[in-house]
Amino acid sequence: MSNGDCPFCQISRGEMDTEFVYEEEDLVAFEDLDPKAPVHVLVIPREHITAVTDVPQDLLKQLINATQTVAEQQGVAESGYAVRINNGADAGQEVEHLHIHVVGGRELGMP
C-alpha cells in the first residue's frame, strides 16, 4: 500500500471527513469507525509507518504519551482503559499504518 492509498495517511492529511480528538505535529487521534467500546480512539503517526518495530524511539514516546492524554480527555483514565497495538496480519492489523487503540468506557476482557 502506498502512502497515497493509505486511509490513515489520508486522515492525517485532512483528506477524509474525520474529526481529530487530539493532535500534535507528528500524530493525530480520532474515533475508531467501528468502535468496540464506548471509547475507542486510534492514535497514529502522521508519517506512514507500518510496524511498531520501525518507529523511532522519540516518536514512540510521543505516541504513548498521547494515549495517556486521550484517555484523560475521554474520561477513562481513572476507571481504566486498554492500549493495544496490532503488529502484522497475524495480530489482526487491518490497516498497514501503525495505530494504537485506546479503548475504555466499560469493563474490558482479554484479548
Where are these regions (language model features)?
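HIT superfamily nucleotide-processing domains
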Residues: 1-111
